[in-house]
Amino acid sequence: MTKQTIAILGPGSWGTALGQVLNDNGHTVRIWGNVPEQIDEINKEHTNKRYFKDVILDENIKGYKDLSEALDGVDAVLFVVPTKVTRLVAKQVAQALKHKVVVMHASKGLEPDSHKRLSEVLEEEIPAELRSEIVVVSGPSHAEETIVRDLTLISAASKDLETASYVQNLFSNHYFRLYTNNDVIGVETAGALKNIIAVGAGALHGLGYGDNAKAAIIARGLTEITRLGVAMGANPLTYSGLSGVGDLIVTGTSVHSRNWRAGDQLGRGEKLEDVERNMGMVIEGISTTKAAYELAQELGVYMPITQAIYKVIYQGAGIEDAIKEIMTGEFRHENEWH
């Protein structure tokens, strides 16, 4: 592949890690952010210590404070901003772009109020003449491991497989491999909804429950993620792949996962506002819980774990009470889809 220029919108942990992958592949990387001190640090110190204390970034990775400058002449744009601001940033991109680009996103969540998937948000805000079909970059991937070039395999999903293949070639190297997929709904819902289950898995750990309970919430969590995704139009096979069970395992079992850590702290009795403040990073599973719960109600999808976590976060229910409600609920067949 010839050298490409990519603007990464969002200098967080994942945006920075993906920037390093692209830089390793010989591409020109521009990281845009709205915190001047962070951009100055990337340019002057070649670090992003808020997320990676011991990592030195390549000097060719440049930070940008001005969005128009970051987008000037690029081949592709990668959104890695929090879900709640994706629409706002997309509006700004639509105003600043002067030519057609490949548009990708690597964020995992649903828009809080509309419950829309992020590719839908990007399609609405960026005119078709300025973009490709959206490509979703998602899968089991801790930024802390990717940044040190540990082996990582994820998916590139798009309605247009040719564009997905472009992204596959853009990122893939000896430690980072992408597989193409045309099930955008499945890949996006899997990436968003697994954060809810990770919060629950962390809470079980914080409460002192063992491996049996953790395995159960991952398995049953995958079932209800699949239920909702299929109701939205996804291919059920996607949930047995990298962006489905793969991402659920890595997020639902690891201390690297901010959603798991948030759940762990809640399980230990800490208040949500304290957990969010101490984390210092966006916990997508919190807002996604509300969106998924409301979607499930709207579509008539049975999601008991999501409902239990919703009650704990938004209705003040005790975690043990929520667990008891699941354990003593109506007996059901394991493979029921409603």
UniProtKB/Swiss-Prot annotation:
Active site as annotated = 194
Q: Which top EC class is named for this enzyme in its record?
A: oxidoreductase
The catalytic activity, as recorded, is: sn-glycerol 3-phosphate + NAD(+) = dihydroxyacetone phosphate + NADH + H(+); sn-glycerol 3-phosphate + NADP(+) = dihydroxyacetone phosphate + NADPH + H(+)
Q: Name one GO biological process term.
A: carbohydrate metabolic process
Matching PANTHER family? GLYCEROL-3-PHOSPHATE DEHYDROGENASE, GLYCEROL-3-PHOSPHATE DEHYDROGENASE [NAD(+)] 2, CHLOROPLASTIC
| The protein's name | Glycerol-3-phosphate dehydrogenase [NAD(P)+]
PROSITE patterns given for it?
Answer: NAD_G3PDH
Q: Which gene encodes it?
A: gpsA
